[in-house]
Amino acid sequence: MTRLSILLLLISLVYSTPYPQTQISKKIGDDATLSCSRNNINDYVVMSAWYKEPNSIILLAAKSDVLYFDNYTKDKISYDSPYDDLVTTITIKSLTAKDAGTYVCAFFMTSTTNDTDKVDYEEYSTELIVNTDSESTIDIILSGSSHSPETSSEKPDYINNFNCSLVFEIATPGPITDNVENHTDTVTYTSDIINTVSTSSRESTTVKTSGPITNKEDHTVTDTVSYTTVSTSSEIVTTKSTANDAHNDNEPSTVSPTTVKNITKSIGKYSTKDYVKVFGIAALIILSAVAIFCITYYICNKRSRKYKTENKV
């Protein structure tokens, strides 16, 4: 009856999916030793077994008797059970790519105190990885749970807009016209880069304008005007750089100014310290008024009693 229970339990274990606890990495041609130890050392081990997922039984062992299944032999897989059946070990020789997979060992135990047919078991799994390259052998002991690296995102210190609001009005310059004797070159500028950096102490705005060139002659004219505006809390600095055309014509040009308006509004918030100061000043004023009232009352009362005493005499 006990053997039948063990057989049925083994069949159910073969088709179950235990979670791997140990991972071993080896190269092709090496030998891999897989071992597991049981936690329950009080019960009697009736039989131990090794099988390979998904449904391949390798061997059944009872003491020194080993029975192999599914074309496995002792020449390929050797079995050992040292330390009085506390540990069971198999050694897979001359590894090939087909030997990779998850191997599971199971202990079938019965209680030594109760005369029952109840069978208890423990199972442990090992994942064997067979590397096809010439890398060194690595044995990795895993805890059974996946671990992903921690990531953290930090917000830059200069982005802090909780106490201010910033409004920009940018007027792009109008067309630039170069008047020459025999030709007219019209250059249109459009704003293409607006970069704003806001800090707790200052705000800066960079405006760079460039655009296409409309040429009515057969020669190439290159004319680039860029504006860089830096706005701080106290001043605005505007820099203009102009590159002349390919013929080095230094004709005067008219450029509409770039208007940048920077409006900063700070909304102050009262802290607890400010409220404490206000409350302290108010309390001091009230106490001073009470003290003055008490002194005045005492003086007036003293004079009144003195006056009544003199009248009685």
Swiss-Prot record:
Glycosylated; contains phosphate and sulfate-substituted glycans. O-glycosylation is required for hemagglutination and hemadsorption activities of infected cell membranes. Induction: Expressed in the early phase of the viral replicative cycle. Keywords: Disulfide bond, Early protein, Glycoprotein, Hemagglutinin, Host membrane, Immunoglobulin domain, Late protein, Membrane, Signal, Transmembrane, Transmembrane helix, Viral envelope protein, Virion. Residues 1-16 form the signal peptide. Disulfide bonds join C36-C105. GO terms for cellular component: host cell membrane; membrane; viral envelope; virion membrane. Residues 18-121 form the Ig-like V-type domain. It comes from the Viruses. Glycans are attached at N71, N114, N163, N182, N262. It is found in: Virion membrane; Host membrane. Residues 302-313 are intravirion. It is a single-pass type I membrane protein. The chain crosses the membrane at residues 278-301. The keyword Glycoprotein applies. Residues 17-277 are virion surface. Prevents cell to cell fusion by interacting with and directing the viral OPG040 protein on the host plasma membrane. The OPG185-OPG040 complex associates with components of the entry fusion complex (EFC) presumably to avoid superinfection and syncytium formation. Via its interaction with C3/VCP protein, protects the infected cell and probably also the extracellular enveloped virus from complement attack. Heterodimerizes with OPG040. The heterodimer OPG185-OPG040 interacts with components of the entry fusion complex OPG143 and OPG094. Heterodimer with C3/VPC protein; disulfide-linked. Belongs to the orthopoxvirus OPG185 family. This is Protein OPG185. It comes from Variola virus (isolate Human/India/Ind3/1967).
